[in-house]
Structures are given as C-alpha cells and as structure tokens.
C-alpha cells in the first residue's frame, strides 16, 4: 500500500487445473486489499495473466510475477515473513506486533499463503505463523482478514491509478464506467 513499506503475497504451491481459481483469487485479493505485489509459482501462468489483466483494466500500482524458487524467495526476503496457517498463533494475538514491525520499524512484509501441503521449512522461516480462527477455511478468506488487520481498514479507501475502468458503487445494480472515454 502506498506510503508504507512493501507488502508482498507469495502463493506457496499451485496444482494446475485444481487450484487455478483459488490462486487467481489470492492475487485479486492481494491487489484489492492493499498488497503491492503477488508472486505465484512458475506453473501458475494462467493466474498471473488474469491478475495482470485485471490490474491493467482496474488500475494499480500492483505487480504480479512468477518464480520457480519459492523457498529461496522466502529465505532471501529482506523483512518480516508471515505464514498464514490454521495452526498458527491467533491473528488477534499477534496483529499489533506485526503492524508495528511494518509501520513503525518500516519492515517490508511477505505474506505466505499455502496452496498445498506446506513443508515445515516454511514454518521455521516465518517470523510469525498466523491463524485466522484456527479453523479450516479458504486461504483467500484468511488473506483478506489478515490484510485488513495489517492495514487497520485503510486499504478500503485505496485509490487505483491508470485504470481503464472503474466500478461505480450503487445500492442496486451494476455500473462500470469506462475511464478512457472521459
């Protein structure tokens, strides 16, 4: 989110065919809720293209990239690593500490979101293993709640630059405005 140290989301693991929609939604959620970029495994090219297309149409800044070195990406990260897992410490117990590291200590934050069985190395590399409710549910829901807690709701007021289209909020119906006609 602009004005803060970087927040990146790393999708750890992707099963083509099975995880395509979920991986795409991890990227879209990261973009919509204040992250600066998402990094997908190199076999998630379809998701990368979809998120890049949405960013082009609805604005950024937001970067999307692929890597074939997930463990190295975590190991080489130059800031705090938060691994979202239902087995982690309760988000409400650690959110203040993580928010302080990000905003006061100016540390970039990498949020690791698992897509399949995450190896124990990831748990060990993480500065925080964080659970949202410590119950089984969607990793997209966990990411959304975590980012909202990290940014304390400020991401909901986000402005998007260089958009071709904009959704016009309405009580009823759908309205999308083409901005290049203005």
Model features per residue range: what roles?
Residues 35, 77-79, 126-127:
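Short, well-ordered alpha-helix to beta-strand connector turns
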Residues 1-10, 18-26, 31, 46-49, ...:
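Haloarchaeal acidic low-complexity proteome signature biased toward cell-envelope/secretome components but also
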Residues 122-171:
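Structured adenosyl-cofactor binding patch, chiefly the S-adenosyl-L-methionine
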Residues 6-13, 109-111:
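Short, hydrophobic/glycine-enriched beta-strand segments
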Residues 48-121:
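S-adenosyl-L-methionine/SAH cofactor-binding core of RNA-modifying enzymes
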Residues 38, 81, 129-131:
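Short, well-ordered beta-strand core segments
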Residues 36-44:
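Short internal beta-strands
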Residues 12-14, 84-87, 113-116, 133-134, ...:
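Fold-independent oxyanion-binding glycine-rich loops
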